[in-house]
Amino acid sequence: DGGNTWVDYTLNTAITLNIGDEVAFRAKADRTSEQDYQDYNKYFYFNMTGKIEAWHNVMSMLRTNDFATYGSVVKYAFSYLFKSCTSLTKAPVLPTTTLASNCYYHMFDGCTSLTKAPELPATTLSVNCYAYMFSGCTSLTKAPELPATTIASSCYAFMFNGCSSLTEAPELPATTLANYCYQNMFNGCWKLTKAPVLPATTLATYCYYHMFDGCESLTKAHGLPATTLADNCYDNMFVDCTSL
């Protein structure tokens, strides 16, 4: 009824929708606690069949009324939320500009019907915030813009791992890197034909580790301007890029 009436949802209860039907979720109380990342069973995640589009602001899962303007998330907030949802064809809006560690960890991992990624406006990142976010999204053809200039350890690790339909990588404007920040970011993106410019001059340990591993359609790599290196910074960066 347009959000006028809300009822409590019991976990693991199936909701049946016909074509054109909609269902909305919002937090019963504002959530400030963090997930226990050591226990997968404590995560909340969707299990769906058919073809499902997720619309509007994902922050309604954390906030009762102010989700439209609330700009930050807690650690592990949306980890695994849509993992292996092969029926998901559209992602919800992710407006948050202040991220917490692991907040989007594995969020869309294995969403094989997802063709377009949501916008990611954050400019300051946290540890593992985007790690594995779109891993295995084999239908994803375009990556979102990634405007962040302040990054963190493993923030993009495995982000597009196995995205076999991705042809072009987004710009990566950060000039100061963090440990493992781009680790395996495009591993297995074998249709990727264009690599981003990498302007960083301050490197970190394993920062580019296996970044383009298996990108066999990549024919050109841009210059790497850093003059002072870090331990293992370029380790296996272009391994198995057979067309390079």
Residue ranges and their predicted role:
Residues 1-244:
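Negatively charged
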